[in-house]
């Protein structure tokens, strides 16, 4: 009876087993018909196990066995371009992959001495983020907002922008509709993103247990690349549904409910996951894979709010764990400003150190100007008599807002972003009528792409700013408009 147990009770994706005296926390348990489970809690008289397959085939009184193995998932380069479930099994109809390397889903995060400061930028291709809320490799940046405000779109655009940048991307779908997942897969295929992307899918039709382990599976796969000295990006879409799945399992196990019926350790649920994302130094990578090179794992957790309430339990928890947040505003989204980023409430705590110097220099005032514009705009609704200075501020603020707007999946490279920031600083910007700003931007960006400017100069070239200023002056004087 030490390595053998009998099913006593079956709940929804959770079973209570008598026996299994030698079972360890996190151990894989084998049931009949090759059904697998993970030890979730150890009690004096019984063991609770979460089932990873179809639990409907289990019956009371059935036997189960210890495997003396911690639950592991396959890792490796062979997974790139594939769609897998939370157990590491392929879901696409492509040929079966042979992987010899496995890794446990639960791991301890790198220690203080294993880490390095965030000092390299991770470009999203989104103008407002790369200029005002910069993200560095190894950072954890929360994306928070109500449903249908473009949270997933920001992450997909970021994945699209990593093309030819030698960054592996992992997209973890937690509790989403299958139709939404298919839509995301089709977008990634359209932009050839599956060449460097792995999709870990646990949809709404999967059990709470599978949704619960999905982000840990994704994190383990990402850590494989980080520990090889590579840069990796992981998107958790979304951790609200992950917390719901954990709450469901905990309530089935009759654990005492706390605030909003979540169990007491829901903070640790997300902190142990997100702490695994970090920039590690070359000595840590050398210990893992004999490569003297630093690696990084950048995380984009997504949290869905209700009516813009960021003070509820899960949002406040994840805000306190992460290194900053991008707040998406429903009102901005409905007024046609997309991406609907609220610059006043969004912040990047460590990304500033990783930002290119030229962008840091040019974007310093823009954030303040936009925040002041939003305040003045609200104030101007109550006052008809405005002085000329306030009117000018409102006009410039509106023009900057238009310049920061972006079409879905239309990513901007670093040179295009610098050009936009230089246009804002240029005297000619004040002369452009509001209704011509978008037209002017499209024309000058198309011109920059046409002459293939990014192939002509390096980002760290001292003359870059002068070259782009000359290009703007040439563009204006030659009336290419």
Curated annotation (Swiss-Prot):
Marked site positions, Required for activity: 346
Domain of life per record: Bacteria
Membrane topology: Peripheral membrane protein
Pfam families: ATP-synt_ab (PF00006), ATP-synt_ab_C (PF00306)
EC number of this enzyme: 7.1.2.2
Coiled coil residues, start to end: none
Catalytic activity: ATP + H2O + 4 H(+)(in) = ADP + phosphate + 5 H(+)(out)
GO MF assignments: ADP binding; ATP binding; proton-transporting ATP synthase activity, rotational mechanism
Primary location recorded for the protein, binned into one broad class: membrane
Localization per record: Cell membrane
SUPFAM superfamilies linked to this entry: C-terminal domain of alpha and beta subunits of F1 ATP synthase, N-terminal domain of alpha and beta subunits of F1 ATP synthase, P-loop containing nucleoside triphosphate hydrolases
GO cellular component, as recorded: plasma membrane; proton-transporting ATP synthase complex
Keywords, alphabetical: ATP synthesis, ATP-binding, Cell membrane, CF(1), Hydrogen ion transport, Ion transport, Membrane, Nucleotide-binding, Translocase, Transport
Binding site for ATP: 145-152
Keyword Ion transport: yes
Primary role: Produces ATP from ADP in the presence of a proton gradient across the membrane. The alpha chain is a regulatory subunit.
HAMAP family according to UniProt: ATP_synth_alpha_bact
Family assignment from sequence similarity: Belongs to the ATPase alpha/beta chains family.
Binding partners and assembly: F-type ATPases have 2 components, CF(1) - the catalytic core - and CF(0) - the membrane proton channel. CF(1) has five subunits: alpha(3), beta(3), gamma(1), delta(1), epsilon(1). CF(0) has three main subunits: a(1), b(2) and c(9-12). The alpha and beta chains form an alternating ring which encloses part of the gamma chain. CF(1) is attached to CF(0) by a central stalk formed by the gamma and epsilon chains, while a peripheral stalk is formed by the delta and b chains.
Name of this protein: ATP synthase subunit alpha
């Amino acid at each position: 009876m030490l390595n053998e147990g009998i099913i006593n009770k079956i709940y929804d994706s959770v079973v209570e087993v008598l026996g299994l005296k030698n079972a360890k926390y996190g151990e894989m348990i084998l049931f009949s018909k090759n059904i697998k489970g993970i030890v979730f809690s150890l009690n004096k008289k019984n063991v609770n196990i979460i089932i990873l397959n179809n639990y409907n085939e289990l019956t009371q009184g059935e036997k189960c066995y210890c495997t003396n193995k911690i639950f592991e998932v396959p890792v490796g380069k062979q997974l790139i371009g594939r769609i897998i479930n939370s157990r590491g099994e392929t879901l696409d109809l492509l040929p079966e992959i042979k992987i010899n390397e496995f890794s446990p889903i639960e791991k301890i995060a790198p220690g203080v001495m294993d880490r390095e400061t965030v000092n390299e930028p991770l470009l999203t291709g989104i103008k407002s983020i790369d200029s005002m809320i910069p993200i560095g490799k190894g950072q954890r940046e929360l994306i928070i907002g109500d449903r249908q405000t473009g949270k997933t779109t920001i992450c997909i655009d970021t994945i699209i922008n990593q093309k030819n940048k030698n960054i592996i991307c992992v997209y973890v779908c937690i509790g989403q509709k299958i139709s939404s997942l298919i839509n995301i897969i089709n977008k990634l295929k359209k932009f050839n993103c599956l060449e460097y992307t792995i999709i870990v899918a646990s949809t709404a039709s999967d059990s709470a247990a599978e949704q619960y382990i999905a982000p840990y599976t994704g994190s383990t796969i990402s850590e494989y690349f980080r520990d090889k000295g590579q840069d990796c990006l992981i998107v958790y879409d979304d951790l609200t549904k992950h917390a719901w799945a954990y709450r469901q399992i905990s309530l089935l196990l009759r654990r005492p409910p706390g605030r909003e019926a979540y169990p007491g350790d829901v903070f640790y649920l997300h902190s142990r996951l997100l702490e695994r994302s970090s920039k590690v130094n070359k000595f840590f990578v050398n210990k893992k894979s004999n490569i003297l090179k630093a690696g990084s794992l950048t995380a984009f957790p997504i949290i869905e709010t209700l009516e813009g309430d960021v003070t509820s339990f899960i949002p406040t928890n994840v805000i306190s764990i992460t290194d900053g947040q991008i707040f998406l505003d429903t009102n901005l989204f409905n007024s046609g400003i997309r991406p609907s980023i609220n610059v006043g409430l969004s912040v990047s705590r460590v990304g500033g150190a990783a930002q290119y110097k030229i962008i840091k220099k040019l974007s310093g005032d823009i954030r303040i100007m936009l925040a002041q514009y939003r305040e003045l705009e609200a104030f101007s609704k109550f006052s008809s008599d405005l002085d000329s200075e306030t009117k000018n501020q409102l006009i410039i603020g509106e023009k900057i807002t238009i310049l920061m707007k972006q079409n879905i999946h239309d990513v901007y490279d670093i040179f295009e972003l610098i050009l936009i920031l230089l246009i804002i600083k240029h005297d000619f910007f004040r002369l452009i009528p509001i209704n011509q700003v978008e037209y002017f931007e499209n024309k000058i960006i198309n011109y920059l792409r046409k002459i293939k400017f990014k192939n002509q100069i390096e980002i760290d070239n001292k003359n870059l700013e002068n070259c782009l200023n000359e290009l703007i002056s040439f563009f204006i004087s030659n009336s290419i408009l």
